[in-house]
Structures are given as C-alpha cells and as structure tokens.
Amino acid sequence: MSEYISPIWDIEIGSYTVQKITRFDVFSSRQAPLDLAEVELPKAGLPTDVDAGTRVRISQGYREKGMWLIFDGEIERMEPRSVTTTIFAQDQGGKLKRTPFSQTFIQIEPRAIFQHGLQKAGIMAYKLSSKPLPPKASFVAGGNCLEVFKRVNAAWGLDWAYYFEPEGEFYWGPWEESPRYLQAELTKLEYGVNILEPTRVEEGGRRGLITTFAMPWIRHSHRVIILDHRHFVDPIEVRVERCHYHHDAQKARLTLEWSRGKK
C-alpha cells in the first residue's frame, strides 16, 4: 500500500540525535511489564558520554501520517563491535525492577501496595484502578517492585496488566477500563491488503500472530480488527498481546501476537 512506502524514525540518545542506524527493535508485552529496545548504529559519531543510564527515545511513523513515540527509557548496557555498537535499553519499568520493596502490610488493598511501590521507585505519574477489592488481613512484600506487583495480582486473583505508556504514565487495572481498551478507532488488518506474511492461528482461532507494515500507533492491549477469510468467515475483534517493532534499511515491520475471548 502506498501509504506505507516511506516509514521514518527519530531516535534521541541523551542530547544526541541519531543520524544513521543499522536497525532498531522494540519489544512490548502485556505479560512482561518492561518494554525493551535494541538500537544498532555505527560507532562513528556516537558521543563518548553515552553510557548506562542515558535516556533513549524512539519514534516511528510516516511523513503523511505523523510520528508516534514507541519507546522512552534508559540504556541498560552497550555492546561495541568492530564498526557498530548495539544499545540495549529498558523503559521506566527498569526503575521498578531496581527498586527493593520489603514491607509488611495489615488490612491492605492492592491499590495501596501499588502506590507504596511506585512512590519508592520515584514514579509520580500513574493511573491505578479505583475498583473496590477486598482487603487482605496481611501481605508481606519482598523483592523488587515488579516482583511484588506480580505477587499482588496473584494474591487477589487478578488478570490485570500493569505497564508504562511510552509517554511516561504507569497503568494498573482491568483491561476494559484501560485507555488502550477505550481507544477511539480500531485498526483493521486485512489479508491481501496489509497482512504481509501467513497468519499463524492457534488454539482453534483463539490466538495468533500477524506481521504487517510499521504501525507505531498500535500498542499491546489495543483492540484491532482482523479480516482474513482463510481462517475466519467474519471479521474478528482481538486484543494485542505483544508487539515487536522493527526498522532497518530495507523494511519497517510490526509483528503482533493477538488473543480473543477474554478480558
């Protein structure tokens, strides 16, 4: 499709605006509340002060459509090679992973535990569900914040995702209350139009995988419409479980895993 012919990108590493890359990949998932990015770029021109902890921002888009931020985080480590350097970065979930959280709570609701953990990690922008949940007589937090948050969901029997928007806000709550569920418009992925590789369908049509053109406006937990008569008689609405954004000199792609039938 002509509208997807010329994808563009913008990468900032600290105060340095990247001019050339070999590739970048961004991985984002409902199941792993820590977005990861890899940027491979020429050594030449990379400032010497770029190191672990340096901020990384990645945007992708099209001149005719605009740009979308798909990653905002910090460098975790760097791997120099002969002519290129690969940068590995984590989003703000890295702060939660690095922050120890050990505390005993009495008569506590899960929202309050999340608030304590976020404050310990210095996270001030967040949206937590206000849905009433029964308090536990006691809860012992131990480990880092991400580990504790996972245990909180398990202790209360919740299938609630928690993640950072690339713009910085942390979200925890039911899928149907999330900003991503409440999106204004659903993207259509159609066989013969913008589905690029054979659709993998599993579990009797409950799960699958699609590769399409770069669509940086799609994020995990969004809803999309799939039209593929090879597998489904009618269009189906699915939830995006994982996103892999890829960009190199030859192509820009989005590979997404999807599921349907649960919230």
Predicted regions located by residue number:
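Juxtamembrane "anchor/assembly" segments of surface/extracellular structural proteins
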Residues: 1-49, 92, 177-263
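Short beta-strand-centered interaction patches in the first periplasmic/extracellular domains
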Residues: 2, 84-85, 89-93, 124-197
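Short, exposed beta-strand/loop patches in secreted or surface proteins that constitute
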Residues: 22, 28-30, 76-79, 161-163
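Surface-exposed cap/loop segments at beta↔alpha junctions
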Residues: 42-124
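Extracytoplasmic/secreted envelope proteins and their assembly/folding machinery
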Residues: 72, 111-115, 146-150, 205, ...
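Short, compositionally biased
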Residues: 73-81, 138-142, 175, 237-249
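Extracytoplasmic/periplasmic, Sec-exported soluble proteins
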Residues: 105-110, 140-144, 216
